[in-house]
Amino acid sequence: MEIDLNADLGEGCGSDEALLDLVTSANIACGWHAGGANAMRDCVRWAVQKGVSIGAHPSFHDPENFGRKEMQLPAGDIYAGVLYQLGALSAIAQAEGGRIAHVKPHGALYNQAARDPLIADAVVSAIHDFDPSLAVFGLANSVFVAAARHAGLAAVEEVFADRGYRADGSLVPRSQPGALIDDENAVLARTLDMVRERKVRAVSGEWVPLNAQTVCLHGDGPHALAFAKRIRTALEAAGVDVVAPGALQADEDA
């Protein structure tokens, strides 16, 4: 059994370089919700050095709210914004001897694309037109994953180790009770359930089936780094190989 571990980097948490020793995929902020040219370059350089798969982490242009405020924009604006951010990170990756392998939207853009077909199609179109070989990271069972596959893109279904789920498979909004799980032992158990059993317990009590292909580890918080290491260690102890999505695909094609 195999799984990818990913983390969102370049967002000013200060643990980026150390996190890259634990994850197999890095989603690098492209400057619109956090980060900037120097942070992007640092993260790309470290990822190249450590052999971690590089991904773009585009968002709405919303640094004031860390990209977490929902926006209703024309599809053309979303398309252009995603293209702009992909181009910036791709240029830096090329200069550092790497390349973008995947795209994972951030924050409100991620959540809206997960449920809104128009937003999902705008993001998917930008990715496809930029480079149809790129994989897409999206919420497991979401509209966004379906849109990516319909467009012929490789879609990697993502689960979250420390987030609450609703019965429909969506994440509990951060403004609501149960959105974040603080108990580390509970998070470890949930992660193993999602990876090995392909299911997660919703806040309402139901089991929700999902296809976990990559697990997001958060790097913010005083104990985040140590806890990320605990999750990786627990997965490996359970016989789960931690590998990047490209390796997963290669194994499936073999």
UniProtKB/Swiss-Prot annotation:
EC numbers, comma separated: 3.5.2.9
Catalytic activity line of the entry: 5-oxo-L-proline + ATP + 2 H2O = L-glutamate + ADP + phosphate + H(+)
UniProt GO molecular function: 5-oxoprolinase (ATP-hydrolyzing) activity; ATP binding
Class of this enzyme: hydrolase
InterPro entries xref list: Glyco_hydro/deAcase_b/a-brl, LamB/YcsF/PxpA-like
Any Pfam family hit: LamB_YcsF
GO biological process terms held by the UniProt record: carbohydrate metabolic process
Record's keyword terms, sorted: ATP-binding, Hydrolase, Nucleotide-binding
Task of the protein: Catalyzes the cleavage of 5-oxoproline to form L-glutamate coupled to the hydrolysis of ATP to ADP and inorganic phosphate.
Record note on quaternary structure: Forms a complex composed of PxpA, PxpB and PxpC.
NCBIfam families listed in its UniProt record: PRK05406.1-3, PRK05406.1-4, PRK05406.1-5
Family to which this protein belongs: Belongs to the LamB/PxpA family.
Protein name (Swiss-Prot/TrEMBL): 5-oxoprolinase subunit A
Gene: pxpA
